[in-house]
Amino acid sequence: VGYEHLNARKGEWAWLLDRIFEEGKSLSALDACITEQIAELGKPGFKHQIVLGLPEAILDQKDWGELDGRTLDFSKEEDQLAATRWYIDELMKRFKAAKYKNLELSGFYWVAETNNYCGQLTVPISEYIHSLGKLFYWIPYWQSKGAEDWKALGFDVAYQQPNHFFNHSIPDSRLDDACAFARKHGMAMEFEFDEKATA
């Protein structure tokens, strides 16, 4: 299945928004859980920082949907930006309306793990995010296009992931290589694993 079969449309973007802010789930559940723990542990002197993911406006998608009475065409950067700004604005509006007691919105995460499809799109997105006083995060996969240029792409923080745990054919030296790459390019590290890591 290629990228062209996976393009989410406005309806799917809206569905994701609804899931993020669903009562009793996701952020709501996290906020309630923290409230329960405060009763036992005491109130911390901070709010827990939340970073929310941004779907990628896939280049050349022409069936995403309408915004302000106009059908968006993602072969045009202005339309990619319009959709992404709409999504960011919705996240900001809903987060504020939810009035979480223990959560604070720190910024946004670019979910695409490579720069193969978005070109320089992240730069104006970053500018918009910064205008809102928020930060922009990225976690490129191992040897992802653009990883070493993460600052030039507009990100404030980037985490290198080694893509090591789930493929047993990859030698453990990948971890050393990924750490060396991260040090060289001023990145943090992110490790993905499942329950087998503690077995």
Regions found by a protein language model. Name each.
Residues 1-199:
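Glycan-processing catalytic domains of CAZymes
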